[in-house]
Amino acid sequence: MSEKSRNIASALFPLGLLMIAMISIQSGASLAKSLFPVVGAQGTTTLRLVFASLILVAVLRPWRADLTAKSLRTVVIYGIALGCMNLLFYMSLQTVPLGIAVALEFTGPLAVALLSSRKPIDFLWVTLAVIGLLLLIPLGTSAAAIDLLGAGYALGAGVCWAAYIVFGHKAGADNGVQTAALGVVIAALFIGPIGVIHAGSALLDISLIPAALGVAILSTALPYSLEMIALTRMSARTFGTLASLEPVFAALSGLVFLHESLSLTQWLAIGAIIFASIGATLGSANSKPQLVPAD
């Protein structure tokens, strides 16, 4: 295999990981909504993070991480951002449709891509992603029905998502995939009290375990491990642009599971976002980012 082919393959590998992660997250979001009537968004977030932390600690063995005082601070911020991102996103799903919530949340990683851009070609990919998002977001009568508080929660989740990308990139560079386990444990400790206050003893209902475990695996354990591997193999800027696929998967999830039809304009939007993601990925192949072993 030539050097150029290896560079392209190296760039496409994290893209594949992110696609699997996003499919998993969308499936988990659908399952999570079934828990809202019982324990609310706060309790669902707590169950998700607690079960996910148990899984990731067992699989990734984070005690092997060599933490310094500086790297510990980064991991703590990463974990808090992760927890708040989960909580605010679920809060938004109580009143805002999945596709719209994801599109609003995406303002976070898009901001990372914009602020991190250095070459003119980067702005082309970001511009394409923005155009696609604007076309995907339902304006008209659908937008008039959007709950403003729910939209605010989604935008807040976007801010946390941006912090998750930036600090996850730094933390992952130091400790690899162990960072995912450490981050989820910190997130569970930070969000847990909120869930307990809101849901109380309902969190101890053993009948919720199968659904909660499914949400933990689909929405946290699997995708965040894959994302952490991807974050160690690409720049924060590239990750932010590639994350534009998230609202695309949300729209497709609505089509498959909720039978929501898409207009020609929305399909064109999906094409624009995918093209932007591919362009950003192939562009990163020439930058030769430093790879960090995933252990």
Indicate where each model-derived feature is located.
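C-terminal-most transmembrane helix of multi-pass membrane proteins
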Residues: 2-3, 7, 49, 208, ...
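Juxtamembrane helix-entry segments on the extracytoplasmic side of multipass membrane proteins
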Residues: 9-15, 38-42, 46, 67-72, ...
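Transmembrane alpha-helices of multi-pass small-molecule transport proteins
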Residues: 14, 37-84, 111-112, 160-164, ...
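Hydrophobic alpha-helical transmembrane segments of multi-pass membrane transport proteins
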Residues: 19-27, 31, 59, 76-91, ...
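Hydrophobic/aromatic residues within transmembrane alpha-helices
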Residues: 35, 44, 48, 92, ...
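Specific alpha-helical transmembrane segments that line the substrate/conduction pathway
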Residues: 43-53, 82, 89-120, 157, ...
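Transmembrane alpha-helical segments that form core, pore/gating elements
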Residues: 56, 112-113, 140-199, 291-295
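Hydrophobic transmembrane alpha-helices of multi-pass small-molecule transport proteins
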Residues: 77, 107, 121-140, 157, ...
